[in-house]
């Protein structure tokens, strides 16, 4: 779960069209959110308030071994009008989870229409007690596509009582670059991320639409980082690849990543898929080419819908569903798109009707499998030599695929979830992490446990156990 200050920072990025997913450090953010999520330790309560549209404050009190806390302030040069308190904020915005990577053409259009982000800035500071530890952060937008990020920590337990990290970031639709300097060991780093291909360059005019693969909105990103510590003369190097796509038949996204560190010989691959609107599955495999050590990690998250009044939640009982449930719901809200859907439906062969299965508690679960089509979905009736017919059908298929993709994404964004259950395990480390996060009255609650197996007695041990309450106006 994000802290309130982290949430405000993300709201600033959204309002100024700064794409966090285009930064190299976030290339594996989806798998980290499902496998490496933090577990609260002890008892913690966080009370925050946005006094104006430009400023906010937060007070944190925790009890782990001893009573400690912190006091934080934040100031933004532009009004943060797109923020909400813990009572009204959606869990999708308050909790780290699956990230839907948008194609570069969509990012370009958003950045092009940006007006307010040229000179925006954010100031943040936090003081910890007991003790004299301080931390601060400055975000200054230099141009539409570049910004300066400075992070500082002052702690008497650190060398020279603190450290400072400076990021000079350039973020465009096609690529992103970061120049980093840290006072800790005089560390200098360079990060680059490049998005391969361009959605506008895909030209299917001369290809029959019946044999176009049923996947669209794919993004391939490749990046690398190079580090050099001048004080210890130690180098660092890593590279990563990310492939993200969405099925045009169901609209469900998936993301695959591959990360390599050639110096230590570490290779890591992840596969994450959003199996339904309310569930996500992730797997990760680590391997070391020098020691031949390997590890398999598995994790998932499952959202629960908020309790609704009778007949307020859409029920598909006693109805036949020929398309995906997400597509049907989206078309009901947008009747103007129904014509494209009906025309596409008549051109293709009839799909097998799928009955819904109703659970207790007025919850309806739709079978995610529509039919047993081939991946390329070849229909002999569409193999026409007429060029005009082929072009018309191509436009209809494109409109329908975009409708299904947008339907699933809008259904995820508009769903009212009350809680999320996360689970992850590692076979080699023999660690199990369980986390529950949800809304309780006007509070956001996070509670979980981390279990490990004692290597000597082979008995489970509690490594972490705690609960956290967050409240924000």
Curated annotation (Swiss-Prot):
GO cellular component terms listed in the entry, alphabetical order: ERMES complex; SAM complex
GO biological process entries: establishment of mitochondrion localization; mitochondrial genome maintenance; mitochondrial outer membrane translocase complex assembly; mitochondrion-endoplasmic reticulum membrane tethering; phospholipid transport; protein insertion into mitochondrial outer membrane
Membrane topology designation: Multi-pass membrane protein
Subcellular location: Mitochondrion outer membrane
InterPro entries tied to this protein: Mdm10
Keyword match Membrane: yes
Pfam families: MDM10
Primary location recorded for the protein, binned into one broad class: mitochondrion
Keyword Metal-binding included in the entry's annotation: no
Family as reported in the entry's similarity comment: Belongs to the MDM10 family.
Protein purpose: Component of the ERMES/MDM complex, which serves as a molecular tether to connect the endoplasmic reticulum and mitochondria. Components of this complex are involved in the control of mitochondrial shape and protein biogenesis and may function in phospholipid exchange. MDM10 is involved in the late assembly steps of the general translocase of the mitochondrial outer membrane (TOM complex). Functions in the TOM40-specific route of the assembly of outer membrane beta-barrel proteins, including the association of TOM40 with the receptor TOM22 and small TOM proteins.
The protein's assembly and partners: Component of the ER-mitochondria encounter structure (ERMES) or MDM complex, composed of MMM1, MDM10, MDM12 and MDM34. Associates with the mitochondrial outer membrane sorting assembly machinery SAM(core) complex.
Protein name: Mitochondrial distribution and morphology protein 10
């Amino acid at each position: 779960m994000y802290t309130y200050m982290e949430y405000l920072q993300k709201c600033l990025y959204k309002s100024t069209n700064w794409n966090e997913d285009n930064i190299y450090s976030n290339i594996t953010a989806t798998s980290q959110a499902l496998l490496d999520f933090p577990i609260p330790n002890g008892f913690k309560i966080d009370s925050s308030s946005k006094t104006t549209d430009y400023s906010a404050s937060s007070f944190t009190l925790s009890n782990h071994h001893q009573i400690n806390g912190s006091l934080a302030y934040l100031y933004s040069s532009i009004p943060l009008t797109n923020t909400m308190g813990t009572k009204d904020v959606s869990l999708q915005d308050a909790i780290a989870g699956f990230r839907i990577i948008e194609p570069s053409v969509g990012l370009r259009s958003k950045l092009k229409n940006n007006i307010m982000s040229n000179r925006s800035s954010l100031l943040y500071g936090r003081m910890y007690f007991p003790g004299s530890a301080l931390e601060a952060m400055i975000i200054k937008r230099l141009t539409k596509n570049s910004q300066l990020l400075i992070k500082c920590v002052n702690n008497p337990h650190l060398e020279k009582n603190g450290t400072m990290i400076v990021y000079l970031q350039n973020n465009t639709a096609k690529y992103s670059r970061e120049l980093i300097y840290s006072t800790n060991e005089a560390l200098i780093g360079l990060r680059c991320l490049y998005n391969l291909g361009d959605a506008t360059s895909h030209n299917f005019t001369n290809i029959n639409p019946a044999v176009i693969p049923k996947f669209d909105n794919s993004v391939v990103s490749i990046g690398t980082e190079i580090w050099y510590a001048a004080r210890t003369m130690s180098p660092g190097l890593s590279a990563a690849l990310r492939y993200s796509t969405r099925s045009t038949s169901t609209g469900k996204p998936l993301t695959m990543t591959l990360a390599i560190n050639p110096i230590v010989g570490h290779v890591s691959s992840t596969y994450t898929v959003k199996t339904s609107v309310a569930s996500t599955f992730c797997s990760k495999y680590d391997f070391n080419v020098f020691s031949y050590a390997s590890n398999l990690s598995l994790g998932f998250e499952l959202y629960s819908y908020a309790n609704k009044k009778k007949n307020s939640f859409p029920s598909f009982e006693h109805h036949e569903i020929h398309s995906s449930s997400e597509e049907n719901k989206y078309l009901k809200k947008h009747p103007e798109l129904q014509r494209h859907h009906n025309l596409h439906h008549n051109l293709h062969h009839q799909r097998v009707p799928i009955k819904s299965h109703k659970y207790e508690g007025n919850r309806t679960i739709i079978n995610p499998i529509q039919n047993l089509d081939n991946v390329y979905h070849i229909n002999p009736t569409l193999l026409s030599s007429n060029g005009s017919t082929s072009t018309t059908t191509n436009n209809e298929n494109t409109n329908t695929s975009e409708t299904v993709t947008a339907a699933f994404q809008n259904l995820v964004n508009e769903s009212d979830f009350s809680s999320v259950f996360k689970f992850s395990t590692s076979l080699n480390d023999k660690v199990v992490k369980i986390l529950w996060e949800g809304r309780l009255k006007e509070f956001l609650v996070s509670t979980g446990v981390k279990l490990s197996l004692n290597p000597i007695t082979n008995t489970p041990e509690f490594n972490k156990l705690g609960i956290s309450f967050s409240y924000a106006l």
